[in-house]
Amino acid sequence: MTPEQSRKIHWASLEILERFGARLHHPEAISLLKSGGADVSDGNLVRIPSGLVEKAFTTVPKRVVLYNRHGQPVMPLEGNRCFYGPGSDCMNIIDHRTGERRRPVLGDVIEGITLCDALPDIDFAMSMVLPADVDQAIADVYQAQVMLAYTTKPLVLVSYELGGLIDAVRMAEAVVGGQDVLRRSPLVTCYINVVSGLNHNKEALQKLLYLSGKGLPALYVPASTGGVTCPVTPAGAVALDNAGVLLGLVISQLRREGAPYIMTGMQPSPMDMRTMVTPYADPQRGIFQAMARYYGLPAFGWGGVSDSKAVDQQAAAEAALTLLAESLVGGNIIHDLGYLESGLTFSLAQLVICSEIIGWIEAFLGGVQVTDETLALDVIAQTGPEGHYLNKEHTRQHFRESWSPTLFDRTDYKTWQDRGGRTLEQRAAERVEAILKEHEPTPLPDDVRAELCRIAEGATSR
């Protein structure tokens, strides 16, 4: 979108909030907004004056930094800097060993987090799947425990309700050394789904208020569907969901000025009226990133996704297209890598393929160095029109600088055939298995692991 189009959508979002209002299903959030100058009618219909929104922009940080377990700032969410990771809570997994589509277990979360820890192009981790072999009411607590134990990378949590989020944050505080350390060097953020831009459920508001109160970054994402809970047209969908994003921003800043806030950059997908499926690999999903650029706020994005049911040509094509598109528009936290079947199924092999694609994209976006050394005019002069560069020192010094795949195949046909003629899916599955056998995540100290177990056990008694 152009800056003028973004401006029009911003004004439309302000009008939606001021004229039509939103339903909020949490008394504390309503009271907070009312004390800030919002109008409340019909119990929970809240209208937000535009001045309240503009004031929130004066206090919210324009830059958020996520840290790893060692306290190192590894994810500065700013400008067009892109960081990549998987998604959460898929109901199915394609077993990389058997090819079977099945229900996941907690062991799959462990393997997925171990894989994220090992892959150099994966910057953060999410749970990937919903384990079916644990108490579903507190599955998010078990996920958080595994995530904190099996990777040192930043984490995007997903919690079902406030109690699970509190437990996960307590675990993170135990890992880094206390709540003050976690606030100064956040290892975690939480992805909060809202029913829609104008319908804010109690659970989402509770989590937003909790994170903002603690000074931890919140990801506030209206989960609208085009043609169902928001207009089917891209502009109308963005305007309505952006109103929800702005409402979340106001609440966070009223709760605590300066609370870090990460907005969504994901366009609501239109329902496919032929299949009644909400597609993930929709080509216009990334246009919401223009609003993040317009506001100068960090943004959540998506990529590496597919509506395919298998790790096949469609899955690879859609993963590559969505990753490239989101990288070009500058999504800061690009999640959902490895998603298949419109977010219902996850594949570790697909995640490995996405990691390879990211390497290609980063090389593509990295540009070219133009210096006397790289222009190599002296080497060209020495070689002459009929010479070659294979024996030149310049070639020896620089040939490794070009991106080289570790998974995609560049051999000739005979070599490929002699090596078994394996498909990309087969090679990716083998890579997954090799990593799981060889990689050992940095363990937590025994006392910290014990504290995480104690918190998880406490969740079972809630």
Spell out what each predicted region is.
Residues R103-N332:
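Helix-rich catalytic cores of soluble enzyme domains
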Residues S31-E100:
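Glycine-rich, N-terminal phosphate-binding loop and its surrounding beta-alpha-beta segment
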Residues R23-I30, D42-G43, D123, L182-R184, ...:
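Flexible, glycine/charged-enriched surface loops at secondary-structure junctions
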